[in-house]
Regions:
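N-terminal Rossmann-fold cofactor-binding loop
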Residues: 82-86
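N-terminal Rossmann NAD(P)H-binding glycine-rich loop of SDR-like oxidoreductase domains
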Residues: 56-73
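NAD(P)H-binding glycine-rich loop region in Rossmannoid oxidoreductase-like domains
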Residues: 93-134, 138, 142-153
Length: 344
């Protein structure tokens, strides 16, 4: 009986040694194994955290780029951004001096390239250099459609360059195995640096009133810069957006003159809106041009005030959950202080 016991014991010892040997292989494969008389249990080993994703941003100091940088840093990205002027350093944000026309390859491999500046300049840079980032997100403009048939030749050229830049970007990205998305904002506001609503607020604040044509009843969809920055981040998680362009308007559609009225209402004190017959307004505009003023308000812009510039946001809502805010500006969004307007 003792011989049988010793034989069984020896067999058990050999079996346990064999188990230890084989389980050691499992441990080397990435599992820590507890060797006790109780059943062995495999516990995943602790690996170092994954390296942070790296983004390259052009136009990072602009009105859309700034909130985009905040969003990237908050999400744990390492960001490399270019600017033509020296910018203050921040944790996780690396600034580089330079302009697109003279830049060479990115300083290191990146996961995504964002362009928040002129699309044609970015497309030229992307074409000039063999950049191999798996993801590209660039801002264009709905001017591609709005100014296609403009009365002004310069505006038609803007639309042409936007159209060609989009085509170049999509073609190059596809050839390089990258996924590109183009976002086309409508009328941008929110940082006090736009050339339309903030300019209206500044002019009205100086005079205490603003003159507009009664015919300025075309519909608009003003969009906040924060909503645009969030859209740029949201498309990264949606493969449906690859190779697509999206119009990005605001969450409210309103008449041009109602939009202007809301802008004037945030001033302290509120500025008055003076509505004139179209012919009278056009004459005053011509006189202003003769005096070298209001050059940005040309005949084509006056015509567009009467047109509905409304875009379908359904594709953006469907593909990446785009949900822009309604138009509710305040003084800070328009770049004006809360002090009293200067009456002239």
């Amino acid at each position: 009986m003792h011989a049988h016991w010793r034989s069984d014991s020896q067999r058990a010892m050999r079996l346990r040694a064999l188990c230890r040997k084989k389980l050691g292989v499992l441990a080397c494969a990435g599992y820590a194994v507890a060797m006790t008389d109780a059943p062995a249990s495999a516990v995943p080993m602790q690996y170092p955290p994954a390296s942070p994703r790296i983004a390259l941003v052009f136009g990072g100091s602009g009105q859309i780029g700034e909130p985009l940088l905040h969003g990237l840093l908050a999400a744990g990205w390492q960001v490399h951004a270019y600017s033509r002027t020296i910018q203050p350093a921040r944790p996780g944000l690396h600034w580089h001096l330079g302009e697109l026309g003279t830049l060479s390859m990115p300083p290191l491999p990146v996961d995504v390239v964002f362009s928040c500046g002129p699309l044609d300049a970015f497309a030229d840079w992307y074409q000039r250099l063999p950049v191999h980032a798996p993801r590209v997100v660039a801002f264009g403009s709905t001017s591609l459609e709005v100014k296609r048939d403009s009365l002004d030749a310069t505006e038609r050229d803007v639309a042409r360059r936007l159209r060609e830049a989009e085509a170049t970007l999509f073609a190059l990205a596809a050839a390089r195995g990258a996924a590109a998305t183009v976002l086309r904002p409508t009328l941008v506001y929110g940082a006090g640096r736009d050339r339309t609503l903030s300019a209206i607020a500044a002019l009205a604040r100086r005079s205490g009133w603003f003159v507009l044509s009664r015919s300025a009843c075309g519909l608009r969809q003003p969009v906040h810069v924060q909503d645009l920055a969030e859209a740029a981040l949201a498309v990264l998680a949606s493969a449906t957006t690859h190779g697509q362009s999206y119009a990005l308007g605001g969450g409210e559609t309103l008449r041009y003159r109602d939009m202007v009225h809301r802008v004037l209402a945030v001033l302290q004190p509120p500025a008055r809106l003076l509505l004139l017959p179209h012919a009278v307004f056009a004459l005053l505009l011509a006189l202003a041009h003769a005096c070298g003023r209001l050059r940005g308000m040309n005949r084509a812009a006056l015509q567009r005030m009467r047109e509905d510039l409304v875009f379908d946001l359904a594709p953006a809502r469907r593909d990446f959950g785009y949900a822009p805010r309604a138009f509710a500006p305040d003084a800070a969004m328009l770049g004006v202080t809360s002090g009293a307007a200067v009456r002239q």
